[in-house]
Regions:
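Long, structured stretches of catalytic cores involved in phosphate-ester chemistry, encompassing
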Residues: 1-106
Length: 106
């Protein structure tokens, strides 16, 4: 897909039952048109209707993943603007997955 958003979520079986089977991190692009915003207008409604989603963000940026034997950490790096020079880079969220668990723990 072509979402131009940041997402993190837990994936479940097709029927939606049981424990999560995997974790997915989705990154936006850093240079697509429009600077985005922290949340889209309907983000709260989308999150409420999709409890498997643990994070959503509409800013431009990229992911940095720190992978160690017992922990995977994903840092959502975002810029406050891309439509003109001088955008400030920051870490919007850091989410982790522990070894042997298919769930986001932080």
């Amino acid at each position: 897909g072509d979402e131009h958003q940041n997402f993190a979520g837990e994936l479940r079986r097709w029927d939606g039952g049981g424990d999560p089977v995997a974790v997915e991190f989705v990154a936006t692009s850093i240079s697509s048109g429009g600077s985005g915003q922290d949340k889209r207008a309907n983000a709260d409604r989308i999150m409420a209707r999709n409890p498997e989603l643990k994070f959503s963000n509409d800013q431009r940026g990229y992911l940095v993943c720190d992978v160690a034997p017992d922990l995977w950490q994903t840092h959502f790096r975002v810029v406050d603007k891309v439509h003109e020079p001088g955008g400030q880079l920051s870490t919007r969220a850091t989410l982790s997955v522990e070894r042997g668990k298919a769930a986001i723990v932080s």
